[in-house]
Amino acid sequence: MRHSVKTVVVVSSLLLGTALAGGAGAQSAGNGVPSTNVNTPAPNTGQSTAQNTNTASPLPYNRATTLPAAGTEDLKKSVQALQNTLTELQALQLQTKQAHWNVSGTLWYTLHELLQDHYEGISKFADDVAERQLSVGASSDGRAITIVAASRLPEIPGGFLDDAQVIQFFTYQYETVGQRIHQRVGDVEKVDPTTANLLQEVEHIIEKYQWQMRAFLQNTPTDPNTGFDINNGKPVPLRGR
């Protein structure tokens, strides 16, 4: 009789240990560790299960990576376009805020307020671009070292900034960034139209900001303004004029 009780206790202990191990495994999987169980059904992406048999794939199941023409190489195009745009937007965030603080001259208050608007708009789109990059399965790199090394944009001068200097600087800077983003739209529009649409929105706002700076100096038939009034009687040079 004692042997029977002992056997029951041992068996019960083994069963309890197995259950606890199973629970720990389930908890580990729930904490973000990928499951290696090949029988786990693939997420429902609206495509046949034959296209989603690799449960160990590092790519997420979303529109950017399950399009018929897409895959690892096309994902790289989207990530590169988004990361480069993010880096440039972050550089512009820093530069617009630097100019917002330090602009001087006749138009200092107008530019002070305008640059704050630009800073807020650029910050909003920087966040959208970073989150889109996460949506397609890559991390976003917003570190200061990355901004300095990879933005490939001229640095804004330190110290006080003359209003004419600020206008010229951002007219060129926005033009450069807008042209780069326009190129990226073409690079990704077929394989990742959602990313392309977002980049078009960014391009639109950057072109708007470029116009708002350029308009301070732009000639019209009735006003041949070239910046004399804010540049000590000398024209402010702009390309194409």
Swiss-Prot record:
Residues that bind Fe cation 2: E131
A molecular function (GO) term: ferric iron binding
Positions with a binding annotation for Fe cation 1: H100, D127, E131
Alphabetized UniProt keyword annotations: Cytoplasm, Iron, Iron storage, Metal-binding, Oxidoreductase, Plasmid
Top EC class for this record: oxidoreductase
Top-level lineage group: Bacteria
Any single Gene Ontology cellular-component annotation: cytoplasm
Chemical reaction(s) catalysed: 2 Fe(2+) + H2O2 + 2 H(+) = 2 Fe(3+) + 2 H2O
A Pfam family of this chain: Ferritin
GO biological process: intracellular iron ion homeostasis
Transmembrane segments: none
Annotated EC: 1.16.-.-
Record's keyword annotation contains Transferase: no
Bias type Polar residues, positions: 33-57, 220-229
Subcellular location: Cytoplasm
Location of the region described as Disordered in the Swiss-Prot/TrEMBL record: 25-65, 220-241
Recorded family membership: Belongs to the Dps family.
Subunit-structure text: Homododecamer. The 12 subunits form a hollow sphere into which the mineral iron core of up to 500 Fe(3+) can be deposited.
Function comment: Protects DNA from oxidative damage by sequestering intracellular Fe(2+) ion and storing it in the form of Fe(3+) oxyhydroxide mineral. One hydrogen peroxide oxidizes two Fe(2+) ions, which prevents hydroxyl radical production by the Fenton reaction.
The protein's name in its UniProt record: DNA protection during starvation protein 2
